[in-house]
Each structure stands twice: as structure tokens, then as C-alpha cells.
Amino acid sequence: MKCAEQDLLLYAVTDRHWLSGRSLRDVVEESLRGGVTMLQLREKTLAEPSFLAEARELQALCRDYHVPFIVNDNVDIALAMDADGVHVGQSDMEALDVRRKLGPDKIIGVSAQTVEQALLAEKHGADYLGVGAVFPTGSKDDADDVSYDTLKAICRAVPGKEESMMRRSALPRVVP
């Protein structure tokens, strides 16, 4: 599965901190029913066995809704469970190495906060960029804010031409 432009129309990223006592599965299913077009499992506090169990359950839900399922950071888990793709940050494995490991048919997203990072991600085979946070957020303590001018510069530098298949998504950090 490759990343199509419509996959990024409503890209949800999980964070159990904001569940307010609800189950992650229920919130994800509600989101899928509401029109989410791609889901990233980003649960930094879960131990690997719990993460894998959660990932398998949510992957099955996403498949029921024909929505790509992306694993955050963990390329080995994405590979082991045949996830649709993986999203990596600047301190994770480089996109070139991720592409070698996952092959040509998986979706690879890369976080970028600068034009240089965006261009390198494109060169190394990323299918989309996650740029942000564009607005201040309380949902990610270590988020580096990206100005609107920087976002525009990234969009100009990596224009998303069909031949490059590069997509961009700004991360506004909307929470329920």
C-alpha cells in the first residue's frame, strides 16, 4: 500500500493521555466512523508486548474501515505485524534505512521541522512529511513549534508533485 493524497485528509495520532477514561479501541472506532483516513498508533508509555497487542487490535479495526494503519517509531513491530507503514522522527531510524527494511510498498512518514529535514526525507524515500507542531500544544512535551513561514517554505521546497509522490501534513495537535 502506498500513501495516497486522500489518506492524509484526516490523519489521527493516538495518545491515551486524552482518553478521559474511555478505551483506546472505542475512541479509534469512533474516529474511524467519523471519517479518519489514516491512523498512527503513538503510545510511548506502553511496554512492547502491550503495544503489540494494542497494535494488532487497532490494525484489524483499521482494515475493517479500509484505513491505513501506521506504527510510530518502531520499524521492527511494523514489519512483524505487517502494518501499512511507519512514522519516524528525526531521532529515529533514517527514512532510507526504513525503506530498505520495509520495502517499496509500505508507507513511510517522517517528522520534519526544517526545509533541510524535509528535503532529506524526500530524497530518502519518505511518502509523506509530518510537519509541526504548527500551533503550541500540550499533547507533546518535546514538540518543536514550526512557524507558518517554515511550513510554507517546506511546502515550496517539497511541492508534493505526483512524480515524487510526496505528501505533507501539518500537525495542529487538535485534541478532543
Regions found by a protein language model. Give the residues of each.
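Conserved N-terminal beta1-alpha1 strand-loop-helix module at the mouth
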Residues: M1-M93, R100-D127, A143-V146, A153, ...
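Short, glycine/charged-rich beta-strand-loop motifs at protein surfaces that mediate ligand recognition
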Residues: G138-D142
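Cationic, amphipathic, low-complexity alpha-helical segments enriched
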Residues: M165-M166, A170-V175
